[in-house]
């Protein structure tokens, strides 16, 4: 690589937590995913806060919270302000994930980490892309291009390919799936051969995955046995990702008459179920070839479900007849309708709980997967209830005081406006030359003013209280009061309003009624629950298995490999396997949390700071697309608060070509201590650079003129003899190859020696010097 490439791990290494990594390519910094775990750990936020103002672009790979969950917080609370790139389905389904996550938390607790407005503000910054669409970055990212490729894990899931100057190829591929499924094709790998750097995960590196047919049979058997035993089935799924695969599978099974499931109910339960299905209908072109053909040939949208009922709450689900199969979010059972149904149904041995996703360790779902024999567990019961009695009275009193304070503030503002209007009116009275005009519409104050020779010191009012109502005006005329136009029959009485405020309504109420306009509080209790229902884990994660991951990496043959997101033993196993088949041709890194990996392979490239006096003294010569100069300088250390991303690079000053090189002479007899410090910074531990405010960076300063040593001329950009022949012919010099030697005008011979250098032979004549000058012009000489 001829670029400086570093990866800083903010989260998701040597563990199964959320994914978040900072990739530096020369001066440009990418944030690869911006995930948040199920427990909303603030450690991820603290790591992100240190680097948030350095980030130039965010690349999102999947729409679930583990890949973009922290984005609303980063934009709303941390001030993240940069371009965000994602595919169209990741944009749409990502919103559904975050809406459902927020509502699931808000229904049972006082959730304040982010709001729906934060979600909207974050997703408004996303630039939506299509698969294989090449985006050339500008500004600091000049020369960089990004391309999203299908990952096959979720709809819109992306493998990101980052290319620098058409040469360096960096591939970010996490949670990919090479197998074709009902609603998605597998990932495309034909465009990812021999990348310079591959960043991938080891989540499934040691996982032995059952065959898909075996998993489908296990699911069908479980569902049939439970329904025929008059029990209900809870399938814990995500909001808008892998749920589409299960919805397609179950709806197809329900259509099959031989299965005999048509008499049972099938439901999808989450806060945005209708929107998820509608978005899926409009994104068929992002799905598998099979669904595309079905849509094109039969003109039948595959997401027009026949048997799947869409429910947005427990009251909707209560109207679905039992026994039933319910696809409910969230997959971790930490919040949402899946947790509510689990608490209701797990104590009945007739029911069945099916887990389809290995969530982060520490969640309820992961506990049940890792401890299948555990039958008793402590569960925190959270719910939102109406305020009653003294609490309700205190709340209403506080609200009343707030309204009175707001009303007083509004009245004071109106009084200020009225006083300003009165002063304007008095100024109008003082103008005797004012021309009085007639209008069809009544203008403000017209006809109510009486002239007076002396200005009154105080405005007179009638004896009895009769305040004059001043007519408010704006650019469009008199301001309208909406309450003046309400139909009296439709206005609620004060008694009804007070009942609504106090939450006192008659009649039956749904178990999940909207409490947004009613005073509520959240309560929490911990109970020991006995699990009598059958709990089963069936893998519908949509990831490649361990053996396939190793074969895919071997097929790609990356020159460097960084392994992230996976347990330590899985990462170690994948690293050893890659070293075994790659040998010395591959470098494998397994970074720790908050560690910076330097993936720059060229040893002569470092980051230094050039003084303006040094840059102004350089004499550049052009070679193809690059400009080169010789530098004589000395390294010094400096404490700087400037972002190191703007530092010029020693190996690529004004460099766009592949043959560029910058050579540095730094005599050892000048400032030896500074040299040692600079070298320690250059070759030392890069992982200490964690984006702190002040960093010690090496600075290259010019040598005094009397200390500048001489140097031999360096010839760069060596030409090919065939190209030089064309140059000679254009100049009217006869040239032809004789035994591998270029003979010019039968007087001068140009040959390439065994060491690869070009030699010029011939008698000293005018043609010799002319040909030599033409040969020199092909080089960049510094």
UniProtKB/Swiss-Prot annotation:
Compositional bias (Basic and acidic residues): 407-416, 439-449
InterPro entries reported in the protein's UniProt record: Beta_Casp, CPSF2, Cpsf2_C, CPSF2_MBL, Metallo-B-lactamas, RibonucZ/Hydroxyglut_hydro, RMMBL
Disulfide bond keyword on record: no
GO biological process: mRNA 3'-end processing by stem-loop binding and cleavage
Gene Ontology MF, one: RNA binding
Record CDD domains: CPSF2-like_MBL-fold
Region of interest: Disordered: 407-452
Cellular component, GO annotation: mRNA cleavage and polyadenylation specificity factor complex
Matching SMART domains: Beta-Casp, Lactamase_B
Feature: compositional bias, Acidic residues: 417-430
Chain positions found as Phosphoserine: 419-420, 423, 660
Localisation: Nucleus
Known function: Component of the cleavage and polyadenylation specificity factor (CPSF) complex that play a key role in pre-mRNA 3'-end formation, recognizing the AAUAAA signal sequence and interacting with poly(A) polymerase and other factors to bring about cleavage and poly(A) addition. Involved in the histone 3' end pre-mRNA processing.
UniProt family annotation: Belongs to the metallo-beta-lactamase superfamily. RNA-metabolizing metallo-beta-lactamase-like family. CPSF2/YSH1 subfamily.
The protein's assembly and partners: Component of the cleavage and polyadenylation specificity factor (CPSF) complex, composed of CPSF1, CPSF2, CPSF3, CPSF4 and FIP1L1. Interacts with CPSF3, CSTF2 and SYMPK. Interacts with ZC3H3.
Name of the molecule in the record: Cleavage and polyadenylation specificity factor subunit 2
């Amino acid at each position: 690589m001829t670029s400086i490439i570093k990866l800083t791990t903010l989260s998701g290494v040597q563990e199964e937590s959320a994914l978040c990594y900072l990739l530096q390519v020369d001066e440009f910094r990418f944030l690869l995913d911006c995930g948040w775990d199920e427990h909303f750990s603030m450690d991820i936020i603290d790591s992100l806060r240190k680097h948030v103002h350095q980030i130039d672009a965010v690349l999102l790979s999947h729409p679930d919270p583990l890949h973009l969950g922290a984005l609303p917080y980063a934009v709303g609370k941390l001030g993240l302000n940069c371009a965000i790139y994602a595919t169209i389905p990741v944009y749409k389904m990502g919103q559904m994930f975050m809406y459902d996550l927020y509502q699931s938390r808000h229904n049972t607790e006082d959730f304040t980490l982010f709001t729906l407005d934060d979600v909207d503000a974050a997703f408004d910054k996303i630039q939506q892309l299509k698969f294989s669409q090449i985006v050339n970055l500008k500004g600091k990212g000049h020369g960089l291009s990004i391309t999203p490729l299908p990952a096959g894990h979720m709809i819109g899931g992306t493998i990101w390919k980052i290319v620098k100057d058409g040469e360096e190829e960096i591939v970010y591929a996490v949670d990919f799936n090479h197998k074709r499924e009902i609603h998605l094709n597998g990932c495309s790998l034909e465009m990812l051969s021999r990348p310079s750097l591959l960043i991938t995960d080891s989540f499934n590196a040691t996982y032995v995955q059952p065959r898909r047919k075996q998993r489908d049979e296990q699911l069908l058997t479980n569902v049939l046995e439970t329904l025929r035993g008059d029990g209900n089935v809870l399938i814990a799924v995500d909001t808008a990702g892998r749920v589409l695969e299960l919805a397609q599978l179950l709806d197809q099974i329900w259509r099959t008459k031989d299965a005999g499931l048509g008499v049972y109910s099938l439901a999808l339960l989450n806060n945005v179920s209708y929107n998820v299905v509608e978005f899926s209908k409009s994104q068929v072109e992002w799905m598998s070839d099979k669904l595309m053909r079905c849509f094109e040939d039969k003109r039948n949208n595959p997401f027009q479900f026949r048997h799947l009922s869409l429910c947005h709450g427990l009251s909707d689900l209560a109207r679905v007849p039992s026994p039933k199969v319910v696809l409910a979010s969230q997959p971790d059972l930490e919040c949402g309708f899946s947790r509510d149904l689990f608490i209701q149904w797990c104590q009945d041995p007739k029911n069945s709980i099916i887990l389809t996703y290995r969530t982060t360790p520490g969640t309820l779902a992961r506990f049940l997967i890792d401890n299948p024999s555990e039958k008793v567990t402590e569960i925190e019961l959270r719910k939102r209830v109406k305020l009653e009695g003294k609490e309700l009275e205190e709340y209403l009193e506080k609200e009343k005081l707030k309204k009175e304070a707001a009303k007083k503030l509004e009245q004071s503002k109106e009084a200020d406006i009225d006083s300003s209007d009165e002063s304007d009116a008095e100024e109008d009275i003082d103008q005797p030359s004012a021309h009085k005009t007639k209008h069809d519409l009544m203008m403000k104050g017209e006809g109510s003013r009486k002239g007076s020779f002396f200005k009154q010191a105080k405005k007179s009012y009638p004896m009895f209280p009769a305040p004059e109502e001043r007519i408010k005006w704006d650019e469009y005329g008199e301001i309208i009061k909406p309450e003046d136009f309400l139909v009296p029959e439709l206005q609620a009485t004060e008694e009804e309003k007070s009942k609504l405020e106090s939450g006192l309504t008659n009649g039956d109420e749904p178990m999940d009624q909207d409490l947004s306009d009613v005073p509520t509080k959240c309560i929490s209790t911990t109970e020991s629950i006995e699990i009598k229902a059958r709990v089963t884990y069936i893998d519908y994660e949509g990831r490649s298995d361990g053996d396939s991951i190793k074969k895919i990496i071997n097929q790609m043959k990356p020159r460097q490999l960084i392994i992230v997101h996976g347990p330590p033993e899985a990462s170690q196993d994948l690293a050893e396997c890659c070293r075994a088949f790659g040998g010395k041709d591959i470098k494998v890194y397994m970074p720790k949390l908050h560690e910076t990996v330097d993936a720059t392979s060229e040893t002569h490239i470092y980051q230094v700071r050039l003084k303006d006096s040094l840059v102004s003294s350089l004499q550049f010569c052009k070679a193809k697309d690059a400009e080169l100069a010789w530098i004589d300088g000395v390294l010094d250390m400096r404490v700087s608060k400037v972002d190191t991303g703007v530092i010029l690079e020693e190996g690529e000053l004004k460099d766009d070509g592949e043959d560029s090189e910058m050579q540095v002479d730094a005599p050892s007899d000048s400032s030896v201590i500074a040299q040692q410090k600079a070298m320690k910074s250059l070759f030392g531990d890069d992982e200490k650079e964690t984006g702190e405010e002040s960093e010690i960076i090496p600075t290259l300063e010019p040598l005094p003129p009397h200390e500048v040593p001489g140097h031999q001329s360096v010839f760069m950009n060596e030409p090919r003899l065939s190209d030089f022949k064309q140059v000679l012919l254009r100049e009217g010099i006869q040239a032809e190859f004789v035994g591998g030697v270029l003979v010019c005008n039968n007087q001068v011979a140009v040959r390439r020696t065994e060491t690869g250098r070009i030699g010029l032979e011939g008698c000293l004549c005018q043609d010799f010097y002319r040909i030599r000058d033409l040969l020199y012009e092909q080089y960049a000489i510094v």
